[in-house]
Amino acid sequence: MNQDLELKIKQRLSGGEGHHHLSPSSLAIPLPKFFINYLMFNQEERRKQIAGYKAHYGNLCNNPTQRFLCSKIFESGKQFTPKKKTLDEHIQDEFELVDKIPARDERDEVCRQEMKQYVKPTTDQIVKAVKEIFGDQTLAAERYVHTNEDGLIFDVLGRIDYESDSTIMELKTKPINFRQTKSGLSAYKQKLLEEPDEAHMKQLAFYWKATDKTPYLVYANHEEYKIFKPELPQLEYYYQQMINKAFIIQNLLEISEAKIETITQLVEPPDFKSFYYNDLDSQQLEKVKEAWRL
């Protein structure tokens, strides 16, 4: 790709504000959602997307645990030492932050309040998993790392959940599910996976490739945790699968010159029944339908 076209593509991304990197999470979403989020919409529009309670559950569990266990945490390119507080105090701080974020609807607000009772038990499971993997090693969290592949115009950039000098850990929480019954809202546990999810393996493979440290993948709910330690050939395979998708995105941007009206002729329409699109507000939904002529 010539430099002029590369510059044009990067400038047109993020609603014309420009975007210069990919991430394991952006590469994990369906292609239509990628182009909606990172070509059609700018950062302000992305922030208007309203996440459901399950998306907040991960932060409610992981952020306090990081502050409780880690000696340093990276934020906005700088590192800080978390204040010495109990785990319960860190959780309460996170509750206060999440409570300021609008709920998606009335049901989501109820679920957000009901899920709080499961946060502390989940953090207790995370603490056990971290201790099993790292022992007494000094830990850091949220450090940015990146990879750059030949021929790919974008760096892939991500933040590590837990890290020591020799080891990394990627955490996935399984929030409580709620079901409406005649007697009201009923809660039931999400079982932990018997085998790692491929999307999570790709994320872990990225952090392994970027750090060359021993990687672990952890799943946790409010009752238990599971630790997976993939073999290196598995990690190499999943990393290449993630990079293959990055090249597909780049090729589509190159063919279309990052014009959404061309992308919508090359990429299948969004499946609005998928949870990936639940966070779009009504105006965004109409804009997306118009772009794909739905």
Question: How would you describe each model-predicted region?
Answer:
Residues 50-53, 187-196, 230-232:
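Short histidine-centered catalytic/ligand-binding loop motif
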Residues 1-164, 294:
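Metal-dependent nuclease catalytic cores that hydrolyze phosphodiester bonds in DNA/RNA
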Residues 6, 87, 108, 112, ...:
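Short amphipathic alpha-helical segments that mediate assembly, nucleic-acid/protein binding
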Residues 196, 209-294:
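Metal-dependent nuclease catalytic regions and adjoining charged, substrate-binding loops involved
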Residues 182-220:
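Catalytic cores of nucleic-acid endonucleases
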Residues 146, 174-176, 222-225:
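Short, solvent-exposed loop/turn segments at secondary-structure junctions
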Residues 61, 156-191, 207:
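Conserved catalytic cores of phosphodiester-cleaving nucleases, focusing on short active-site segments
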Residues 140, 163, 167-171, 215-219:
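A structural signal for short, well-ordered beta-strand segments and their strand-loop junctions
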